[in-house]
Swiss-Prot record:
Family indicated by similarity: Belongs to the formicidae venom precursor-01 superfamily. Ant pilosulin family.
Propeptide: 22-54
Main location: secreted
GO cellular-component term (any): extracellular region
Signal peptide interval: 1-21
Source taxonomy: Eukaryota, Metazoa, Ecdysozoa, Arthropoda, Hexapoda
Localization (cell): Secreted
Entry keywords, A to Z: Disulfide bond, Secreted, Signal
Protein's job: Causes a significant and dose-dependent histamine release, probably by influencing the signal transduction of mast cells through a non-IgE-mediated pathway. This peptide does not have cytotoxic activities.
Protein's recorded name: M-myrmeciitoxin-Mb3a
Length: 91
């Protein structure tokens, strides 16, 4: 009698293990996917910041070229005022 109870208990444990194993697999797979998604977001944000910094550098270069052109034309006072305004904007 005890042997049949033991085998019945083992059968129930085996069935429960089989039934619940897909849930455990899903939980095990969810963590790496979430980490990969988080890393992808981090890289995407890093790329966006790098592009924004490149755009700022390009704007500064364009402004410098404009100021050089203004100075060449002989508008030194205007160039000095523009430099002050631009410095205040970048601070």
């Amino acid at each position: 009698m005890k042997l049949s109870c033991l085998s019945l208990a083992l059968a129930i444990i085996l069935i429960l293990a089989i039934v619940h194993s897909p849930n455990m697999e899903v939980k095990a797979l969810a963590d790496p996917e979430a980490d990969a998604f988080g890393e992808a977001n981090a890289f995407g944000e890093a790329d966006a910041f790098a592009e924004a910094n490149a755009d700022v550098k390009g704007m500064k270069k364009a402004i410098k070229e404009i100021l050089d052109c203004v100075i060449e034309k002989g508008y030194d006072k205007l160039a000095a005022k523009l430099k002050k305004v631009i410095q205040q904007l970048w601070e």
